[in-house]
Amino acid sequence: MKMKSQATMICCLVFFLSTECSHYRSKIHLKAGDKLQSPEGKPKTGRIQEKCEGPCISSSNCSQPCAKDFHGEIGFTCNQKKWQKSAETCTSLSVEKLFKDSTGASRLSVAAPSIPLHILDFRAPETIESVAQGIRKNCPFDYACITDMVKSSETTSGNIAFIVELLKNISTDLSDNVTREKMKSYSEVANHILDTAAISNWAFIPNKNASSDLLQSVNLFARQLHIHNNSENIVNELFIQTKGFHINHNTSEKSLNFSMSMNNTTEDILGMVQIPRQELRKLWPNASQAISIAFPTLGAILREAHLQNVSLPRQVNGLVLSVVLPERLQEIILTFEKINKTRNARAQCVGWHSKKRRWDEKACQMMLDIRNEVKCRCNYTSVVMSFSILMSSKSMTDKVLDYITCIGLSVSILSLVLCLIIEATVWSRVVVTEISYMRHVCIVNIAVSLLTANVWFIIGSHFNIKAQDYNMCVAVTFFSHFFYLSLFFWMLFKALLIIYGILVIFRRMMKSRMMVIGFAIGYGCPLIIAVTTVAITEPEKGYMRPEACWLNWDNTKALLAFAIPAFVIVAVNLIVVLVVAVNTQRPSIGSSKSQDVVIIMRISKNVAILTPLLGLTWGFGIATLIEGTSLTFHIIFALLNAFQGFFILLFGTIMDHKIRDALRMRMSSLKGKSRAAENASLGPTNGSKLMNRQG
């Protein structure tokens, strides 16, 4: 009788459990910071409106149930009298389903606590209350037991939210001793919701911090990853890649290269993480490790999830690169290939601040921004571990400056050619004294140097290094460097001649000696600087930039071989102009105060003439180097320097009354010769006619 009652009780319990399971509907409610656990009790049902169709009242809300096999609801908000989808919690995943194939009794796990364990010969299934418990029980070594169920699920907003919380829980509870196998399974799960097809669904997740939580969870999990080899590719999924290597204070400069596609049809986008040598010296002698993770779609997901956030108005234009480094390392160099490579697609380097949950512009500094790629110097901290580039809002500014430069260079080249033609025409009439001779020698060489430099600059700006010869680009860079330096040194020599003319009155230097000094300064000094620069930097391939035919800055600072001489000469020439201005305002003996206006006009004229001839316009370049400089300085600098050839023609040639007089005399002489030629041609003909008439 006792055995019969026990058997009856067991049958009743089994029937009760099966009935409960058949009526059980799993539903999860995800909030920031919640743990994924088995739902207890019946899910709460909210107000559900069967249809959200037709006209509506503004700001009103509506909800509909999810499709079959999904639990949750879809929320709509009325906007302009139309229902628009605003939120979605439809999910087909649950903690139980993740492990249903791992044990036959997992479907009974929810009701298991109510089973009377003292019943003879009955073993209740072990309760799976959380993801951590399920993984520890079923797949503690590789986490592979959860991947198939996740990868087969549809990427609805509810499932995405579930998977984000799943990864967040794993990073929090199971991130000790992360192996390569665990990282692979973890990344497979993350890859599923990083797919381009899932991007639009991120916008409807109620928790707008889900994308930021995902990024932070991946970084936290990767921090505990152990690398066995010196360098290895750990994860190579379509939408997430992980690489790492061992480092110590004796390691040379290290870099990690990524090549990923936004989808299966587009070309790969490149990214590189570089740890400078000076940073590696900060490490202790014992080995450390550096890990980097690349995401091609996460930038779009972060933007999609924060469309209402005013701090994210611009599009991410490259990979999102996360790094996990030892605490002593603070500075890294990142290279991003642009997704949008149009000419006006300027970029801004940024880092993702995990606490503020927004892109932080102060985390990075721009090192290089060209059409195809961007190089950034970024500060790595515990709250800023992920970096990318945003589309800059200053694209129209750059477009305007490009137009100014293009038009200005064209006008400048034509003006310089005309200047040289005029100088050749009036040369014999204007070089009557040693001072005038050297003055025009300076103007001619300034014009020749600037004209040649502009031509080489145009050649270099249209030169494709990847498609054309490397050595040819080196030659273009060398000649551009040499002739721009020649321009500045000839302007320096002209300034020295002005000072010499003011200070030395009674003693004059021989013309031949002045010519030797002039050509030694004008061409000798630039040649020495240019040759020395290429000899020092080119053996290490650091003479020119990798993307353009111009002096390198990032690696060897070869650009200083142009910038330092140029700005020093501009400073010296500015002093000369001030000396001329002071000397001009000295009143002559017997002059009255009524001549003040005349003196001011004379000073203004001298300054206007000397400014382009002595290169003072390049001084505005200092202002443009300062971050946050007003657009006005950039436009002024572009105008003055692009049109420098025109100003040389205007102030150095046309406004010189001696040249104008010489041109008039030359024109009169040409007219006189043409009339004489006409008379000479008509003379014999008229004589023959008279002889014929007399005959």
Curated annotation (Swiss-Prot):
PROSITE patterns per the UniProt record, alphabetical: G_PROTEIN_RECEP_F2_4, GAIN_B
Keywords: Disulfide bond, G-protein coupled receptor, Glycoprotein, Membrane, Receptor, Signal, Transducer, Transmembrane, Transmembrane helix
Transmembrane stretches, start-end: 407-427, 441-461, 486-506, 516-536, 562-582, 607-627, 635-655
First and last residue of the signal peptide: 1-21
InterPro entries: Adhesion_GPCR (IPR051587), GAIN_B (IPR057244), GAIN_dom_sf (IPR046338), GPCR_2-like_7TM (IPR017981), GPCR_2_Ig-hepta-like_rcpt (IPR008078), GPCR_2_secretin-like (IPR000832), GPS (IPR000203)
Region (GPS): 349-397
Entry's Gene Ontology BP terms: adenylate cyclase-activating G protein-coupled receptor signaling pathway; cell surface receptor signaling pathway; G protein-coupled receptor signaling pathway
Residue ranges that the UniProt entry lists as topological domain Extracellular: 22-406, 462-485, 537-561, 628-634
GO molecular function terms attached to this record: G protein-coupled receptor activity
Cysteine pairings via disulfide bonds: C349-C376, C364-C378
KW Iron (keyword) present: no
Region span, Disordered: 674-695
Subcellular location(s) of the protein: Membrane
Protein name: Adhesion G protein-coupled receptor F4
Gene this chain is encoded by: ADGRF4
